[in-house]
Amino acid sequence: MLLGGKDKKGSLFIVSAPAGTGKTTLVNLLVQEFPTVIASISYTTRAPRLGEVNGKDYYFITESEFEAKIAAADFLEYVKLYDTYYGTSREWVEIQRQLGLHVILVIDTQGALQLQKLCEATFIFIRPPSLDELKNRLINRQTESLEMIEKRLACAERELEAAQYYDYEIINDDLQEAYQVLRSILIAEYHRISKKL
């Protein structure tokens, strides 16, 4: 299914969720189904995890390179979490939107709240069914230490409180159901006449 063409500026969608909620999986499903939807690739100063590819999963750069980009105002938004920077290229997002592509930023709630003040976008929060289920998912993906999982769970509680500032909330209890809701939001927002009511 196509959503628009190159004659209309693409929309901006912000998707946030605690780590392990399935936000990246859901966004990847959208990108696979809709040729005019593209997910932004964030810059980060953290080391790649096993199997991650520079330029596909993230742009992995040094802290000094990241700070130079901050000084040059290259980021649409950026945050520092757990001593690691994450940021979104301002220029890349604008180019994609001018080409008529709908851009999805998968970012944390801090970055999303920054953007609410700066640009028109649709904000979507993905919620886990429970914190216990989230803990199980984080343990089962086996990418982080128990100490980091505990930090992520503490952060998740704060992120869940930020959901009230989003336009939509989806509970990811069943991946296919959550995807159908996310897909419906994307289609409805594309057909919206005006964001300002």
Swiss-Prot record:
PROSITE patterns associated with the record: GUANYLATE_KINASE_1 (PS00856), GUANYLATE_KINASE_2 (PS50052)
Main location (coarse class): cytoplasm
Record domain Guanylate kinase-like: where: 10-187
EC number: 2.7.4.8
Subcellular location: Cytoplasm
Catalytic activity: GMP + ATP = GDP + ADP
Entry similarity comment: Belongs to the guanylate kinase family.
Function: Essential for recycling GMP and indirectly, cGMP.
Protein name listed in UniProt: Guanylate kinase
Organism encoding this protein: Protochlamydia amoebophila (strain UWE25)
